[in-house]
Amino acid sequence: MTTKKTSSVVLPLLLVFALILMPMVAGQLKSTCRIAEAWKGAKECNAKCAALGTTRGGVCQKFLGDLYCCCWD
């Protein structure tokens, strides 16, 4: 009896949770990342992204020991 009650409550809650998360995941910004050996920080990365024509700038990220400059598309 308790299992039926619990499952009848949990399933609708999971559906509502999924409906809330779907727009969040779908609306994420896409970025193009390039290896940033020459860049030393965020200012250089933002300048490079501005030169490439992006309006939102960029961010430096370290991944597997390399520094990447990611420009928002």
Swiss-Prot record:
Disulphides: C33-C71, C45-C69, C49-C70
Q: Name one GO cellular component term.
A: extracellular region
GO terms classed as biological process: defense response to fungus; killing of cells of another organism
- Highest taxon listed in the record's lineage: Eukaryota
Keywords from UniProt, A to Z, are:
Antimicrobial, Disulfide bond, Fungicide, Plant defense, Secreted, Signal
Keyword DNA-binding assigned: no
Protein location: Secreted
Task: Kindly report the protein's main subcellular placement as a broad class.
Answer: secreted
Identify the stretch annotated as signal peptide in this record.
1-27
A Pfam family of the record is AtDEF-like
InterPro entries, alphabetically?
Answer: DEFL
Q: Which family does it belong to?
A: Belongs to the DEFL family.
Name of the molecule in the record: Defensin-like protein 87
Q: Which organism is it from?
A: Arabidopsis thaliana
* Species classification: Eukaryota, Viridiplantae, Streptophyta, Embryophyta, Tracheophyta
